[in-house]
Structure formats: C-alpha cells, structure tokens
Design a protein with these regions (language model features):
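Hydrophobic transmembrane alpha-helices and their immediate junctions
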Residues: 4, 303-334
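N-terminal signal-anchor transmembrane segment
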Residues: 1-50, 68-75, 129, 194, ...
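TM-adjacent membrane-interface loops and short helices in multi-pass inner/ER membrane proteins
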Residues: 256-288, 294, 301-308
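Interfacial loop-to-transmembrane-helix boundary motif in multi-pass membrane proteins
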Residues: 3-12, 54-67, 89, 97-125, ...
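Transmembrane alpha-helices of multi-pass inner-membrane enzymes
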Residues: 42, 161-164, 332-341, 345-390, ...
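Flexible juxtamembrane loops connecting transmembrane helices in multi-pass membrane enzymes
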Residues: 225, 229-261, 281-284, 400-418
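Aromatic-anchored transmembrane helix interface
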Residues: 35-41, 58-71, 78-100, 119-120, ...
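Alpha-helical transmembrane segments of multi-pass inner-membrane proteins
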Residues: 39-45, 90-93, 107-136, 147-211, ...
Length: 435
C-alpha cells in the first residue's frame, strides 16, 4: 500500500528533482536547497518510523559509546563540526527508517524505474555537446544541475546498479532500454573524467561477475556497452583534434596532497581528530573536503570516527556473508564504498540520498539475527530518543536560521561544495546581502 512506502516515495521525488535540476526556491542554489530538504525527510523518519526500528546489541553499544564521546566534546565544536554531525545523524535516521520500510514492502520497481529514467534524460544532451565539441572545439554543459560535474557522476553510480537489478527482474521494456542507458551513463562518466565512478562501477561489476554465474553474460554485455561508449568518447576527441578532456588524466586532482596535509594535522591530535569540516573551516586552497570518507572519519573525528568505521566494516561483512542478499545488491554496495574512497559521494546531498537509497535496499534484504530480540526494543527507543534530541538541538541552535531563510544562499569561499554549495559558508544569507 502507498502509505507503507511514503519515505521511499519522498526520496524518489527528492532524487528526481535533484537530477532534473528543479528546485522550489527555498534557496537560490539547488545544492543548498537539497541540503535543507534533508531536514524534513530526517524528521519524518525520526517521528514516524522509529517505533518500528530495532537495533542489534552491537549497534546499541557502538552508538551509545559514540554518543558519550561526542557529548564530552560538544562544547568544543564549531559550526562546521555541527554541520557534519547533523548531516551524519540525518543520513543514519533516513537509512534506518528506509531499511525498515523496504523490509516490509514489496514492489518498489516502479519507483526505481522512474529514478533511472530521470537520470537517463540529462545524458541525452551529451549528443548536443558532442556535436558542438567537434564543430567548435568547446565543451558545453549538458547536465541539468551542473554546478559541479562530480555530483551527478556519483549520483548515477548506485542508479547504474538499480538498472541492472530491474534488467534481471525483466522489468517491462528494459530489455530495450538497458543497453542505451548503460551506454549513455558510461558516456557521461568518460566525458566528465569521472575516474572514481568508473573504477567503482567496474569493481562492482567484477563482484557481480564473481558472485553469480547465470549473469556473467550480462556483465560481459554491460562491459561491451561501456567499451562502446569509450570508443565514442575517444573518437569525439580525435575528430575535434583537441584533447581537452580525458578520463585517463595523469594528475592526482590534489587528492594525495589533501590527504597528506590533513594527516600531518591529525598527528598533532589523533584522539579527537582535526574536527569535522576542517578544510572548509581553514578555506583550504584545493577543496573543502578530502574526497575520502574513510580518511575523513579517522582524521577529522579521531577515535569517534574509528569506532564508527569499525561498525561500518562489521555491517558490510555481515551483508556480504548473508546469502539472502542479492548479488547485485552486494555489487552496488561495493561500488558505493569504492566511490566514497575517492570522491565526495557521501558529502553532496543528492549523491548522499542516492547512496542511502541503495544501501537501504541492500540492507533490507538481510536476514535478521536473533540478537535483535534478546533485549526489549525499549533500549533502541531510548537510544534513538537521545540522538533525536541531539539532532533537534543542532537543528534549532545552529541551522535554524538557515531553515527559516527563504530565498537565501551560501557565499563564503570558493564554489567547492561541502555542506553548502560554497563550502566555506557557515550560514545562508539573503541573496540581496551577498557581497
């Protein structure tokens, strides 16, 4: 029934809106608006679905410990750390509620198909850009929300594996749609130079190839479509006679430099870390985040980040050894984990929600262990209430003015997104007040 999948539908609408570049005007920039829209989604998850959520004993202990350690440091946090903490709590609430919802509902294929088609539509405009590139040797933006090309690249990584899922389910007409969509998704990654997304997808396909025999022909066909896109990409550059874009770049995109810089700062305070949003706070010249989820947890959050990382590893291992989880779900999770190692997929709001949707889809297939029922669900409710109180406290005290500011925008620092579109921004301000 419709009422049993409301959160899934809301997230589907959120992603379609993000992909097609539509925004309602809550903020001047769509990126900032997508961040603001995460609040009602998280609040809905907290208020409506928490009564259905049960955490294992291990999860209860981990988040109780993280909560205690976080509480001892709250008075030392600045606005950037509160932004990062708020974002983490928001995503975990949505992930927990969505996992519970998907575990109890059946058919979600239609909603997934809508998201896939929405992601496919902007890719069609690559053809126009290719023609212009050949004729004028100038590349024109083809995305509907091209504030930064990397955002869209990470959004379609989990959507790529949803596409394979529907192909396996013999979803109507996807037999014809599948090769075209794969080709255009790959074309988007090649022209954007999205090495992280390409590595993530190919690794995910390798995992899918290993885990399932009956779909190995499908994997090889998919690789063929990707290779065809690569040939079109290289041919375009050849005919344009101007190699201005290439996925095979020799530069590092300053990833290694950022990692080394933050590592040197972290060595001075390894237990507490340098603080969430550290690069945004100091206006680091190469970017406002280090493009690596795992190093970010360790270097920025210290012991708290390490504990959370242990919990993540535990959940991933349990997911992969669970035979009830579909191979395509394991492949998609692998791709998300790889992409998070080199990109901002778990920083940008649209890619965050796309990844959370796929993770919830995968985790919802897991067979629940008996450890979930050893203790009363009252322990889980108390834990959620405490984290919910912290979530509301941060929202009111540190993000209240942003949520209540209609038509505002970020403006501080470079247009290198982090929590806000301009990553160095502490709070949104009315557009008329932007210098």
């Amino acid at each position: 029934m419709l009422k049993n999948k409301i959160l899934f539908l809301l997230i589907g609408i959120y992603l379609v809106e993000a992909i097609l570049g539509y925004h309602i005007g809550w903020s001047i920039y769509q990126y900032d608006e997508l961040r603001l829209l995460q609040f009602p989604l998280a609040l809905y998850a907290l208020l409506i679905f928490t009564k259905k959520i049960e955490y294992s004993i291990f999860t209860q202990i981990i988040f109780f410990l993280i909560g205690v350690l976080t509480a001892t440091q709250l008075t030392n946090y600045n606005i950037f750390q509160f932004q990062e903490l708020w974002s983490a709590i928001t995503l975990l609430f949505i992930l927990s509620a969505l996992t519970s919802e998907l575990r109890n509902v059946g058919n979600i294929e239609h909603g997934i198909a809508l998201i896939i088609v929405a992601a496919f539509i902007p890719c069609l405009f690559i053809l126009i850009s290719i023609i212009n590139f050949i004729l004028y040797k100038q590349w024109f933006d083809w995305q509907f929300n091209s504030g930064t090309i990397r955002i869209y690249d990470s959004v379609i990584v989990p959507i790529f594996f949803f596409l394979i899922f529907l192909k396996n389910r013999n979803y109507p007409y996807f037999h014809y749609f599948y090769p075209i969509a794969i080709f255009f998704f790959a074309l988007a990654w090649f022209f954007d130079g999205a090495r992280s997304a390409l590595l993530a997808v190919m690794t995910g396909l390798l995992v899918f190839f290993i885990y399932t025999r009956k779909n190995r022909n499908l994997v090889l066909q998919t690789c063929g479509y990707i290779f065809l896109a690569f040939l079109v990409y290289k041919s375009t550059i050849y005919f344009a006679d101007k190699n201005t874009m290439t996925a095979m770049r020799t530069g590092t995109s300053m990833r290694a430099e950022m990692w080394k810089f933050v590592f040197e700062q972290w060595k001075e305070k390894p237990w507490t870390g340098v603080g969430g949003g550290y690069l945004a706070e100091i206006q680091y010249k190469y970017g406002h985040h280090i493009h690596n989820l795992y190093l970010r947890l360790i270097f920025e959050w210290g012991i708290v980040g390490c504990i959370f990382l242990i919990w993540m590893i535990y959940q991933v291992v349990r997911l992969f050894i669970d035979k009830s989880v579909l191979p395509i779900a394991k492949a998609g999770v692998t791709a998300i984990l790889i992409d998070a190692m080199f990109s901002g997929s778990m920083v940008y709001p649209a890619s965050q929600m796309a990844c959370i949707l796929f993770l919830a889809f995968a985790v919802s297939q897991r067979q629940q262990s008996k450890e979930y029922f050893k203790y009363s669900c009252g322990v889980t409710k108390i834990l959620i209430s405490l984290w919910g109180a912290l979530f509301l406290y941060i929202t009111i005290m540190y993000l209240g003015q942003d949520l209540t500011c209609w038509g505002c925008a970020s403006y501080v620092g470079r247009m290198a997104p982090n929590f806000w579109f301009y990553g160095g921004t502490e709070h949104l301000i009315p557009a008329t007040q932007i210098p």
